[in-house]
UniProtKB/Swiss-Prot annotation:
One of its GO terms (molecular function) is voltage-gated calcium channel activity. This is Cation channel sperm-associated protein 3. It catalyses: Ca(2+)(in) = Ca(2+)(out). Pore-forming subunit of the CatSper complex, a sperm-specific voltage-gated calcium channel that plays a central role in calcium-dependent physiological responses essential for successful fertilization, such as sperm hyperactivation, acrosome reaction and chemotaxis towards the oocyte. The chain crosses the membrane at residues 49-71, 81-107, 109-131, 144-160, 169-195, 243-268. Testis-specific. GO terms for biological process: establishment of localization in cell; flagellated sperm motility; sodium ion transport; sperm capacitation. The keyword Magnesium does not apply. PANTHER family: CATION CHANNEL SPERM-ASSOCIATED PROTEIN 3. The CatSper calcium channel is indirectly activated by extracellular progesterone and prostaglandins following the sequence: progesterone > PGF1-alpha = PGE1 > PGA1 > PGE2 >> PGD2. The CatSper calcium channel is directly inhibited by endocannabinoid 2-arachidonoylglycerol (2AG). Indirect activation by progesterone takes place via the following mechanism: progesterone binds and activates the acylglycerol lipase ABHD2, which in turn mediates hydrolysis of 2AG inhibitor, relieving inhibition of the CatSper channel. Pfam families: Ion_trans. Residues 72-80, 132-143, 196-216, 237-242 are extracellular. Its main location: membrane.
């Protein structure tokens, strides 16, 4: 029986060597403990700091500006050294950012979609250099890799909470928008077949716009966006199609005024929901920060009280009055002291008079309010005797 168990175990191992490696590696990796907690905490504080975010936003923005200058051949020729230096600086900054984030949390870093977007952008950065080294400068598709460098501006998404909120809203509307687009496609399919049969006849039909299904779909898309629909309708009127105007008006009403507005409405609804959720999360974060600050203050107060109690326990004084007397003996003639007759000082008298003025103003306003309340109540009492006989008359009539 032990041999059979050993054979079965060996058969499983031999069938999946990758699983065996992962099974052996995971416990070892879980038991692994890093000894650089202080350094990692410092790097994390640097990454989460406001100054670091400002540096990254400024770097990405300046690189986008230099890329706009790079599109001009004259500027590229005259500022070649500056553009090359800015390129090297930007690539080094982005690579350093990636290295720092992976160093802080090498496992959870890959679970964030925006971090994966940064990795893809860095791969796109190195793509032109790799193609020039491997395929040469005359490679056919090298211009595509150069054009993809415009994706660098997407690094700003990770540093803008507002943009992330909008992207979340767009992601939540995928299924609803897909349903709306499917309905619009079905509507266009029905009208494309109908338009091909009505206006795409071989004899006197409009072959450019309705000659086949693909042309009919493209024409209907122009009608749905209400782009040049008058020119399309004029071509149908020139061929004297009887139902052309009814066809065009009905499709524009359904496609443009209903489905496209429905699409916009769905986007607005989900965007508002995402904004409300973002505001709630921001409020919770502010409350957590406030509670954290309060906890720090309370902890400091507790430590101070504990320190004072410890000092009092270790003191030689038997009572508080004795402690005060001993404290007075340590005073010199140059030490500042708070006088007991604070109520007779000029600042206190000034504040006291101002408080009395505020109190008189408040009493005066309250009296005016009471007068208005009494006046309203008197008017209500005057109306009550007039309503009472009417109710009695109704009772008598019954």
């Amino acid at each position: 029986m032990s041999q059979h168990r050993h054979q079965r175990h060996s058969r499983v191992i031999s069938s999946s060597p990758v699983d065996t490696t992962s099974v052996g590696f995971c416990p070892t990796f879980k038991k692994f403990k890093r000894n650089d907690d202080e350094c990692r905490a410092f790097v994390k504080r640097v990454i989460m700091s406001r100054f670091f975010k400002i540096i990254m936003i400024s770097t990405v923005t300046s690189n986008a500006f230099f890329m706009a200058l790079w599109t001009s051949y004259d500027i590229r020729y005259r500022l070649f050294r500056l553009l090359e230096f800015s390129e090297i600086f930007f690539v080094s900054i982005c690579t350093s950012e990636l290295s720092m984030k992976v160093y802080v949390d090498p496992i959870n870093y890959w679970k964030n979609g925006y971090n994966l977007l940064d990795v893809i952008i860095i791969i796109v950065m190195f793509l032109p250099y790799a193609l020039r080294q491997l395929m040469g400068k005359q490679f056919t598709y090298l211009y595509i890799a150069d054009g993809m460098q415009s994706l660098r501006i997407l690094k700003l998404i990770g540093y803008s909470q507002g943009i992330r909120t909008l992207i979340t809203a767009v992601g939540q509307t995928v299924y609803t928008v897909a349903s709306v687009l499917l309905l619009l496609f079905l509507l266009m399919y029905i009208f494309a077949i109908l338009g091909f049969c009505l206006f795409g006849s071989p004899d006197n039909g409009d072959h450019d716009n309705w000659g086949n299904l693909a042309a009919a779909f493209f024409t209907l898309f122009s009608l749905a966006t209400v782009d040049g629909w008058t020119d399309l309708q004029k071509q149908l009127d020139n061929r004297e199609f009887a139902l052309s105007r009814a066809f065009t008006i009905i499709f524009i009403l359904l496609a443009s005024f209903i489905f496209l507005n429905m699409f916009v409405g769905v986007m607005i609804m989900h965007t508002e929901d995402s904004i409300r959720k973002f505001e709630r999360e921001l409020m919770l974060e502010q409350q957590e920060m406030l509670m954290g600050e309060k906890q720090v203050i309370l902890q400091r107060q507790q430590e101070e009280i504990s320190r004072l109690m410890h000092i009092q326990k270790n003191a030689d004084c038997t009572s508080f009055s004795e402690l005060v007397e001993n404290f007075k003996k340590t005073l010199s003639h140059t030490d500042p002291m708070v006088l007991d007759d604070f109520g007779t000082s000029l600042p206190f008298i000034d504040i006291y008079f101002s408080t009395l003025d505020y109190q008189d103003t408040t009493v005066h306003k309250l009296q005016e309010l009471y007068y208005e309340i009494v006046h309203v109540l008197s008017l209500m009492l005057e109306d009550l005797p007039q309503e009472k006989p009417q109710s009695l008359e109704k009772v008598d009539e019954k």
